[in-house]
A protein has these predicted regions:
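Hydrophobic core of transmembrane alpha-helices in multi-pass small-molecule transporters
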Residues: 27, 93-146, 374, 385-408
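A membrane-interface helix-boundary motif in multi-pass transporters
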Residues: 83-90, 166, 186-208, 300-306, ...
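Central cavity-lining transmembrane alpha-helices of secondary-active solute carriers
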Residues: 54-79, 92-106, 172-180, 310-328, ...
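Helix-loop boundary and gating motifs at the non-cytosolic
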Residues: 2-64, 258-294
């Protein structure tokens, strides 16, 4: 039986500082994702890759999330490094991400060192760029998985919502920085110091961001150390790892399973929104609001991207504000056992205010319903302003979607680990009310955490295994990535039925005047509507989670 020894702690004199340091890696993760999602498609097209093949490349995202995060979670859960279970993998993966970003940005220059002829270098350049994208996707999923698990491992049950909220805040900051960096002419400001193009300079900045943000979190956090008994098997084969993942999926605790199913149905809706919102906004503009001269644009695709990005900046501002304000207005899942004592003068007011706060489940349900209401109106959008309004309405639901599942799963994992009532004692790190971490010391028999091997026990033991946050968050990510494959399948059918050819808004030759059909429903809007209906199912599944174990939700849904 393995044991966790030592003390988990976070540097910093105040709760705010500690939470920022704990979640700081999220800024680099989000910034890197944003640069990849925004700039890699035109970059691949510029290298000579066809659009159909480019779309296949982006299977890397959900594929890496489906495969890498659960495996990384299992490996990290059993890591016996003296530096802890999560941080060594975070650092190694961040280095791989940074190196791959540099390869991606300077692909032409690297290939030119080996292949001199321009035409002969095209295929090797494309191949190297595609490999770099896959490596970035796979490695950054490891950083993401370990950073989430680090929050769960380090914070007690009462602080799980706070930790998830701060991760959402750092994520929104990463998005804001990404939008700002992408909108600035870096060549004019920095010259050619970091590269000869905007994309090259952004990849260098992203590499610095992922390394720097990961280093800050790893420096600030001290983990418990996993100690294996003498003679115990130190590592598992890939087959054993996959068996453990499958076994854990089959024997998930009921409430964890309910959270996963709610996530599954909601992400069918979020996939269409996240991947197609910019294009939908641009197409709506060209279909209903663009003046005749705009329809004749030689760069309709570029114009569409800029128009969509301008609206998404407003959306990102709403997300940014919501990430800071909403957690203050929502009651923690375990707030009853962790209350700060306000001054007597305002104690009555604070008590009444806390009684009026909605809980996290209610907030998540409201987020589902608001998103569903907004996107169900997408097929009826007949103006760019109305489409922008609908997208902006999804800002707060997105904030909740990034925060609620992680917080709720963190609470459940902590309860499985004995972090709730009857669990280990806590020690305060400072005089400020806030973060209290488990007091787990070497030789303290009442505080040492023992880990059972999930492959060596009964079903009940598998369901209640402690300190397996890595594999649980990896499984949650499976329920996040599978809907992306479903969304791709749905979009393929809708596009083939409604817009089997080229998008009429992208014809670039005045499509409305040439008789190209634009009066029918927009195919992307139909995908958004289907996603809205799926999110209604997610709201129902989340409501079932409130009723108890949540078994009813997946008895009829999966």
């Amino acid at each position: 039986m393995a044991t966790l020894v030592g003390s988990a702690s976070i540097k910093g004199s105040t709760e705010t500082v500690r939470m920022v340091l704990l979640t700081f890696a999220t800024i680099g993760i989000t910034f890197t994702w944003g640069i990849e999602m925004t700039y890699c498609t035109p970059y691949l097209l510029n290298l000579g890759l066809t659009k159909s093949n480019t779309s296949l490349i982006w299977i890397a995202g959900p594929l890496s999330g489906l495969v890498v995060q659960p495996i990384a979670g299992v490996i990290a859960d059993e890591n016996t490094s003296k530096w802890g279970r999560r941080r060594p993998l975070m650092v190694a993966s961040a280095v791989i991400v940074a190196a791959s970003l540099l390869v991606l940005g300077f692909t032409r220059e690297i290939v030119a060192l080996v292949v001199a002829d321009g035409e002969s270098a095209t295929r090797p350049t494309i191949f190297l760029a595609v490999v770099a994208i896959y490596v970035v996707d796979f490695a950054i999923n490891v950083v993401m998985s370990c950073s989430r698990s680090l929050i769960v491992d380090t914070l007690p049950l009462e602080m799980q919502q706070t930790g998830a909220a701060w991760a959402s805040r750092m994520s929104s900051i990463g998005h804001m920085i990404g939008y700002a960096a992408g909108s600035i002419d870096l060549l004019q400001i920095l010259g050619t110091t970091l590269g000869d193009s905007q994309f090259q300079q952004l990849t260098v900045i992203a590499a610095i961001a992922i390394l720097g943000s990961t280093a800050v979190t790893c420096w600030a956090v001290t983990e418990k150390v996993l100690v294996m008994p003498k003679g115990a098997e130190q590592s598992k084969s890939i087959v054993q790892v996959l068996r453990q993942i499958l076994s854990t999926v089959r024997h998930l605790p009921p409430r964890v399973r309910a959270i996963c199913w709610a996530q599954f149905w909601s992400w069918i809706g979020w996939f269409a929104f996240l991947f197609y919102n910019t294009t939908w906004l641009g197409e709506t503009y060209f279909r209903y609001d663009a003046p005749p001269e705009a329809r004749q644009s030689k760069d309709a695709l570029g114009d569409m991207g800029r128009i969509g990005s301008a609206s998404l900046f407003v959306y990102s501002c709403i997300t940014f504000a919501g990430a800071f304000v909403l957690p203050l207005l929502v009651r923690s899942p375990d707030e009853g056992g962790f209350t700060q004592r306000p001054p007597r003068a305002i104690a009555g007011f604070v008590k009444k205010l806390n009684e009026k706060k909605p809980d996290l489940l209610t907030t998540w349900i409201c987020g589902h319903l608001l998103f569903a209401a907004a996107m169900s109106l997408a097929p009826f959008a007949r103006s760019f302003r109305f489409a922008t309004f609908l997208v902006c309405l999804c800002g707060l639901p997105w904030t909740i979607a990034m925060w609620a599942p992680s917080a709720l799963l963190g609470v459940e994992v902590n309860r499985l680990s004995g972090g709730g009532e009857g669990g280990s004692a806590y020690r305060r790190l400072s005089d400020e009310p806030g973060i209290e971490l488990p007091e787990v010391g070497v030789g303290a028999s009442d505080a040492t955490v023992y880990l059972e091997d999930p492959m060596a026990g009964t079903d009940a033991e598998v369901a209640s295994t402690a300190e397996l946050s890595g594999i649980y968050f990896g499984i949650l990510n499976i329920y996040t990535t599978l809907p992306q494959f479903c969304g791709t399948f749905i979009a393929t059918i809708v596009f083939s039925l409604l817009e089997p050819g080229k998008s009429p808004e992208l014809s670039g030759d005045g499509s409305a005047d040439k008789g190209t059909e634009t009066s029918g429903p927009n195919a992307i809007a139909v995908c958004l509507f289907i996603g809205a209906m799926s999110t209604v199912v997610a709201a129902f599944a989340t409501h079932k989670l409130r009723a108890g174990s949540g078994k009813g939700a997946f008895r009829i849904l999966g």
